[in-house]
Amino acid sequence: MIKLNVDGSEIEVSEGSTVYQACTQAGKEIPHFCYHQRLKIAGNCRMCLVEMEKSPKPIASCAMPVSNGMVIHTDTPMVKKAREGVMEFLLINHPLDCPICDQGGECNLQDQAFRYGKGTNRFHENKRSIKDKYMGPLIKTAMTRCIQCTRCIRFASDIAGIEEIGAIHRGEHIEVTSYLEQTLDSEISGNMIDICPVGALNSKPYAFKARKWELKHTASIGVHDAEGSNIRIDSRGDEVMRILPRVNEEINEEWLSDKNRFSYDGLKYQRLDRPYIRKNGKLVEASWSEALKTVADKIKSVKPEKIVAIAGSLSSVEAMFMLKTLLQKLGSNNYSVNQFDYKLDTMQRGNYLFNTTIAGIEKADLCLLIGANPRQIAPVLNSRIGMRVRADSLKVARIGGGHNQTYKIQDLGSDIKIIEELAIGTHEFTKALKAAKYLMIIVGDGVYARDDGYAILSLIHKIVTEYNIMRDDWKGFNILHNHASIVGGLDIGFNTPIKLEELELAYLLGTDAIPFDKLKSTFIIYQGHHGDAGASSADVILPAAAYTEQSGIYVNLEGRPQIAEKAVSPVGVAKEDIEIIKELAGYLKIDIGMDNLQEVRVRLAKEYKVFASIDRIIENKFSKFSSKDKLSKEPITAEPINYYMTDVISKNSVTMAKCVEAKEARDEEVA
């Protein structure tokens, strides 16, 4: 520990800390623009100047390491004058855009100019202006406002792993640019908006829409992937205006994927706002009572074993649990969250989780990707891997896939024989596996979405056992899930094998990705919020609330249950999922024993211990899996997906459609 004096107070800080961190620990507020705790130090704004005894001039506290016996002053006339001077220089070329700037009200420059500036301006020359740069459909630029803090540049290279932003020229002519002015090739580019301390980088979809003080903030969870990123929904009235990240050090830190951040406009389009019944081949509007009575009458006329419920990728745990309870009361055990027929082993909870945990990536020294594409499936998780690789503390190899993961990676090939050789120890990469103390294996849908997924999974389990990576001090086996609902569904047993061709009635809970050609003679009930494939095929449509319009539990890929709170009201006469299921149970004269959300959650906590520990990860068991299925000769792949459109909300988002167009245009230019 290092001892130093800050404004007369003796403090101790860890070795390697900066003076800025020491001052912050001492409770002192140090103004800054370029410094960010998650980025490399630049030291170029000079706003964090403090006085150090025996130093002839103020020092940049963010870049100065602490040493024993330092005496620091943060509020002397010298410091005050230095900060006023720096602020005056920063404002020389900064435009008076505050009334029309989207950063107004949440701008670091505004706040610090008010607190640390002189209050008067001595500059009477012409201000410089800079042409705005094009960075794609998500980021709106106003580069005349840029103060050259270089946060965006460092984020792009250090966190996102893309070397596409930099500075050109020198002195007062310096400009931050994307060089070729193309769409940024990153799935987490929107975070540059958050870290920009001024209004140089703003959200293009949110431009001129609202001011901070007009918005209601609601804590929620991102549902467009399985990471469980913590988000804040900002709404005005019953409209979602924007989505921002919430800090959670164990999951997303303070970052957010572009799909979770920008796809909210999809909540406005193609919404199901009233019930429909198919009559004479056409869907016609109906009342709730008529729709529910039709559903109840049809259910009563079908044998229980011919009824199935399938949950979609955005379904909450509570909705699946109530629907499962209803089907069990009817005498049916046909229900599944596995609409894509993934080959997942569910003998133990640790067999289908990301056991290392997202934060645990910091400890790994070797990562083996098998049929996994974390860049598109879990962008924020992938950025953690990338940061470790760029710090030379993690090596990554992969089997299957030739896509760019934004970091250095060793390609082992795509032949299934590679996994067999690793399992028996004859492959040359075996040496690296043996040398690794904390080996992490990530299995993606390039494995479990295959017909021979169980056979490959069995081989991977042999590797897990051979190298003992599921032990008390380290959990190295990981399944990379790609949907928000799947872990929660598996946790409650909403996962029985089903054969669609043998069914007479299908209850689809927001399901749009099943092969509907197998359900041509099946009566389909669709409970969901968007008019997509499920609604188009339905005989009865029950309009439900989206994730922003109801409270629900989602379990992320590492097995952590979290609550997404209700931010706005459902559209039209749509109802919350559990309310629809409860009313349907009433028409069926069935008592499911749960009348409200609180009762559902109490029952969940009693029956499944994971739901008694919201926001926490419980200890999970793991057991070796073996299969006698035959391996195919097809190579393992992890093909790039249409990242921006993976569910009904993102598919109906105008912003996401623009992203797809921009990416296609960029790819054509590069080609």
Curated annotation (Swiss-Prot):
EC number per UniProt: 7.1.1.-
Binding site for [4Fe-4S] cluster 2: C146, C149, C152, C196
Residues in 4Fe-4S His(Cys)3-ligated-type domain copies: 78-117
Listed InterPro entries: 2Fe-2S_ferredoxin-like_sf, 2Fe-2S_ferredoxin-type, Mopterin_OxRdtase, Mopterin_OxRdtase_4Fe-4S_dom, NADH_UbQ_OxRdtase_75kDa_su_CS, NADH_UbQ_OxRdtase_ferredoxin, NADH_UbQ_OxRdtase_Gsu, NADH_UbQ_OxRdtase_Gsu_4Fe4S-bd
Amino-acid positions noted as binding [2Fe-2S] cluster in the UniProt annotation, renumbered to this chain: C34, C45, C48, C62
Catalytic reactions of this protein: a quinone + NADH + 5 H(+)(in) = a quinol + NAD(+) + 4 H(+)(out)
Domain 4Fe-4S Mo/W bis-MGD-type, residue spans: 215-271
Annotated 2Fe-2S ferredoxin-type domain residues: 1-78
GO biological process terms, semicolon-separated: ATP synthesis coupled electron transport
Annotated cofactor note: Binds 1 [2Fe-2S] cluster per subunit.
Requisite cofactors: [2Fe-2S] cluster; [4Fe-4S] cluster
One of the record's GO molecular function terms: NADH dehydrogenase (ubiquinone) activity
GO terms for cellular component: membrane
Assigned keywords, A-Z: 2Fe-2S, 4Fe-4S, Iron, Iron-sulfur, Metal-binding, NAD, Quinone, Translocase
Annotated residues for binding of [4Fe-4S] cluster 1: H94, C98, C101, C107
Domain of life: Bacteria
NCBIfam families found in the cross-reference section: NuoG
Role, per record: NDH-1 shuttles electrons from NADH, via FMN and iron-sulfur (Fe-S) centers, to quinones in the respiratory chain. Couples the redox reaction to proton translocation (for every two electrons transferred, four hydrogen ions are translocated across the cytoplasmic membrane), and thus conserves the redox energy in a proton gradient.
Recorded family membership: Belongs to the complex I 75 kDa subunit family.
Name of the molecule in the record: NADH-quinone oxidoreductase subunit G
The organism of origin for this protein: Rickettsia conorii (strain ATCC VR-613 / Malish 7)
